[in-house]
């Protein structure tokens, strides 16, 4: 009753019957507006879904080929196309371009719902014996033609698989990987990790944790994303601690190639 009285203040000229008729009219208007707005929102149509195993491939002079399984776990048939790309980096940023160093067959195939396709990958170019070569194989879903009158957006799945051709001599990553730490803004807690991979093969970082090197190992900042640093590459990793950093020394624990490696670093200001 109190709510009705409050609402009547906005309709001083209406009686109770007129008020309820107006309320129902407004409700109908809101309903019409809702359907008009909803009709303007594009419909998103998802194509099929597929998975791959393994999720990375390593080849070498002694192992020049590999097999991958692509499984359609969805309820619809789908078509998948393969693209082979050479993978390089400039200051740690990925650069991709088409390559014929590797072959993958079949390059395009239909994948019925619930089925599995075998992909065979092989080397067409001899590996460089001193430095690892890196590639990316893109598995791209080709969505079917939209039905007549469909005005929405079709979303197709794309998976990128790293492929490495190992050099003949591989040195331990931790012996050829360097991390230095700089603070670009002490008050705001901005940290720059200068990373350098001097080795002949890639380094995969699965996360970095930075602690105060004061014996208590209080966590200062962390980076939880996955990244690759290819052979001979460098990268500046920018991390924000979200608070002022008082420590002068740091203990950096890097989850690198499946193991945790520790680095001691002193703070510097670039």
Name these PLM-found stretches.
Residues 99-126, 219-245:
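Intrinsically disordered, low-complexity Pro/Gly/Ser/Thr-rich segments with frequent PxxP/GP/PP motifs
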Residues 125-170, 246-270:
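Terminal connector regions
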Residues 76-84, 149, 202-208:
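Short, hydrophobic/aromatic beta-strand segments
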Residues 73-121, 214-217:
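Surface-exposed binding patches on compact interaction domains or structured appendages
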Residues 70-74, 194-199:
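Asparagine-centered strand-capping/turn motif at beta-strand->loop junctions
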């Amino acid at each position: 009753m109190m709510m009705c009285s409050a609402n009547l203040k906005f309709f001083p000229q209406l009686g109770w019957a007129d008020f309820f008729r107006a309320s129902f009219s407004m409700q109908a208007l809101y309903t019409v507006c809702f359907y008009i707005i909803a009709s303007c929102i594009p419909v998103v149509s998802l194509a099929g879904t597929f998975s791959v195993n393994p999720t990375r491939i390593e080849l070498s002079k002694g192992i020049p080929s590999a097999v991958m399984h692509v499984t359609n776990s969805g309820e619809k048939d789908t078509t998948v196309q393969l693209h082979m790309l050479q993978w390089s980096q400039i200051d740690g940023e990925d650069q991709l371009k088409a390559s014929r160093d590797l072959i993958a067959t079949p390059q395009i195939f239909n994948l019925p719902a619930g089925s599995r396709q075998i992909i065979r990958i092989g080397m067409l170019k001899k590996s460089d014996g001193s430095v690892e070569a890196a590639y990316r194989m893109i598995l791209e879903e080709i969505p079917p033609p939209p039905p007549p009158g469909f005005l929405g957006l079709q979303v197709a799945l794309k998976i990128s698989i790293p492929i490495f051709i190992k050099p003949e001599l591989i040195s331990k990553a931790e012996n050829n990987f360097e991390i230095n730490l700089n603070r670009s803004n002490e008050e705001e807690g901005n940290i720059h990790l200068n990373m350098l991979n001097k080795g002949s093969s890639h380094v995969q970082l699965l996360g970095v944790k930075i602690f105060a090197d004061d014996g208590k190992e209080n966590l200062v900042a962390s980076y939880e994303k996955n990244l690759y640093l290819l052979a001979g590459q460098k990268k500046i990793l920018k991390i924000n601690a979200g608070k002022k950093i008082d420590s002068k020394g740091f203990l950096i624990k890097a989850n690198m190639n499946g193991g945790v490696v520790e680095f001691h670093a002193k703070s510097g200001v670039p």
